From Swiss-Prot:
Keywords: Acyltransferase, Membrane, Transferase, Transmembrane, Transmembrane helix, Virulence. The lineage of its organism: Eukaryota, Fungi, Dikarya, Ascomycota, Pezizomycotina. The gene is sirH. Acetyltransferase; part of the gene cluster that mediates the biosynthesis of sirodesmin PL, an epipolythiodioxopiperazine (ETP) characterized by a disulfide bridged cyclic dipeptide and that acts as a phytotoxin which is involved in the blackleg didease of canola. SirD catalyzes the O-prenylation of L-tyrosine (L-Tyr) in the presence of dimethylallyl diphosphate (DMAPP) to yield 4-O-dimethylallyl-L-Tyr, and therefore represents probably the first pathway-specific enzyme in the biosynthesis of sirodesmin PL. Its EC number is 2.3.1.-. Disulfide bonds: none annotated. This is Acetyltransferase sirH.
Length: 406
């Protein structure tokens, strides 16, 4: 039987090879669009399929992280190459990264270059611009924390402390989750957990769902802080171009705001691009109309559902979405219902107040927690809480001893 499996060295270099393929396609330019798609799309699909041959030699969370990035690159290819967004929208670097949280302002350049090697360099630049901060394609609602000219040494000190704080939070939650019947340590239990989370009472599932959300929050924010510090030290970015990954928790009082401003915006560019393409280019809906607004909403969450379902497929090597399609797919109807309830309340004379925000906080916590329960439960049952023990970590050792004490 013919196998599509490549030698292990290519599987290990899967992500760099995928990005090299995308940058090559971008460098060929829109004038050779048909040729570059025919050349690079089969290569992309072939490289993505290598995830099906990747052996699990470590915790399941490592496999999930790698496949999440693989699926992310698929949608980057759609955005850059199939939709030709960089050339169609004339992406450019902004002058001194003068941006606001609601979008970019003043331009420094006038779109991608035309030469092959110049486009390779341009592709490398935008590929390493996380969330495209400081570029004309920057996503909305990114929490801009620093003004232009913010001192680098202050930024490095502040972000280093922030990374340390989230590292401690991450280590604490990892030790706690490993101590539950639904987790463990990879060096002693390199299998799935002993007890399925789906066999515990509903409220326990709800609690563990939020524990997992906070663990993801701490892990991503720690990584984002470290990346910001390294980027600023190496002069690859300015402090203004390295904001926090998450928004202000004070905005966590509607499901819409939870997704649009509080949670990380790493997928915002891809989801909004697909939504705009369907609403304006395919369906020719009027900008700002009711239909356009909700088509973009449903398509955006559809893209997110497809990405996370694809990750589950690559991890399980089977047609299994781990309830990702349900969780992400149901968020759009919830937000649509929420919008109409809020609009009705305003028409009846209700105004924003601390009481309504508290009620909104409770509603949002329950709505996300219960709809996310099946998806998070599937990941935990797959071994998401079976962590790698850091034998040289004094902090982790102290936390383990503290939890094991009667």
């Amino acid at each position: 039987m013919v196998s599509a499996k490549l030698p292990s060295i290519f599987i290990e270099a899967q992500l760099p090879l995928i990005y090299a393929n995308i940058i090559l396609a971008f460098a060929l330019g829109p004038q050779a669009h048909t040729f570059r798609v025919c050349l690079t799309l089969p290569i992309l699909l072939f490289l993505v399929c290598q995830s099906l041959y990747r052996e699990q030699n470590g915790p399941w969370e490592d496999l999930l992280s790698n496949n999440s990035l693989v699926m992310f690159t698929v949608f980057v290819y759609i955005d850059w190459i199939l939709l030709q967004s960089p050339d169609r929208e004339q992406w450019h670097k902004l002058n001194n990264a003068k941006t606001e949280s609601n979008g970019p302002t003043k331009a420094k350049e006038s779109g991608p270059p035309h030469g092959f090697f110049q486009r390779i360099w341009f592709g490398c630049r935008i590929a390493t611009a996380w969330r495209y901060i400081g570029w004309s394609c920057q996503v909305k609602n990114v929490p801009m924390e620093h003004s232009a000219g913010y001192p680098r040494r202050y930024f490095i000190a502040r972000k280093s402390l922030r990374a340390l704080a989230f590292y401690l939070m991450k280590e604490t939650l990892e030790v706690y989750t490993a101590s539950t019947p639904h987790g463990g340590w990879w060096d002693t239990q390199n299998t799935k957990p002993a007890l399925s989370i789906k066999n515990v009472p509903l409220w326990h599932q709800f609690k563990y769902t939020w524990v997992h959300i906070f663990l993801a929050y701490a892990t991503l924010e720690m990584a984002n802080s470290i990346l910001g510090v390294v980027s600023v030290i190496l002069h690859l970015a300015t402090p203004q171009e390295c904001p926090s990954a998450f928004g202000d928790l004070e905005d966590f009082f509607t499901v819409r705001k939870a997704w649009s401003t509080v949670w990380h915006q790493h997928m915002r560019r891809l989801t909004s691009t697909m939504g705009l393409f369907v609403a304006r280019d395919l369906m020719q809906l009027r900008k700002g109309s009711f239909q356009s607004k909700y088509v973009q909403l449903f398509v955006g969450f559809g893209v997110s559902a497809g990405l996370h379902a694809g990750v589950a497929l690559l991890c399980s090597k089977a047609l299994n979405d781990d309830s990702a399609l349900f969780f992400f797919g149901i968020q759009a109807p919830i937000i649509m219902l929420e919008d109409h309830v809020i609009a009705k309340g305003k028409s009846l004379g209700f105004k924003d107040s601390p009481l309504w925000r508290f009620i909104g906080f409770v509603w949002t916590t329950l709505a996300i927690g219960f709809t996310c329960r099946a998806w998070v439960g599937s990941m935990i049952d797959n071994g998401m809480w079976v962590h790698a023990r850091k034998k040289d970590s004094v902090i982790q050792g102290l936390l383990i001893n503290a939890i094991q004490q009667p």
